[in-house]
Amino acid sequence: MASALIEPRVLRGFRDYLPEEMIPRQRMINTITAVFERHGFAPLGTPALEYSEVLLGKYGADAEKLLFRFTDNGGRDVSLRYDLTLSLARVAAQYGNLPVPFKRYQIAPVWRAERPGHGRFREFYQCDVDIVGAAGPLAEYECIQVDYDVMT
C-alpha cells in the first residue's frame, strides 16, 4: 500500500530562508558580531529549551501566551525560549564565578506562540547585548554606544 503524499509546507508564522536571503543576513550578523566584540562583549550560547518556570518569571501569567510549552520525555515542564534576557538571568544566577562586569552578546532564534501577522513571525532572531554587574549610567551609555556603532 502506497503512503499518502505529504504536502511540503512551512507552519504558519515560520519561514525558510533560502541562500539569497541567508547570505546577506549572515553578513549582517557577522558585522554586528564584530562591533560587539570590538567593544569587549563576549558571545554567550544558551539552550533553546528552558524550564518553563525560568521563562514565566519575567511576565508570569502574561508569558503563558508566549510559550511553546510542553512536557518532555523526562516529564519536565519545558518551553522554547521567547526571549534571550531570561536565559542570561539564569546563567548569571547559576554561575556565580562570572567576571564582573559580565559583558555578553547573543544572537539566536527565539519562539513566541502568539498569533502571527504581517511581519510578525513565531520564530525570529533576537540580538542582545548586556552588561551584568555594573552599577551606574556608564554601562547604559556603553550599550547605547554599541547600538549606535551597529547602526552606522
What would you call each of these model-derived segments?
Residues 1-152:
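TRNA-recognition modules of translation machinery and tRNA-sensing kinases, especially anticodon-binding
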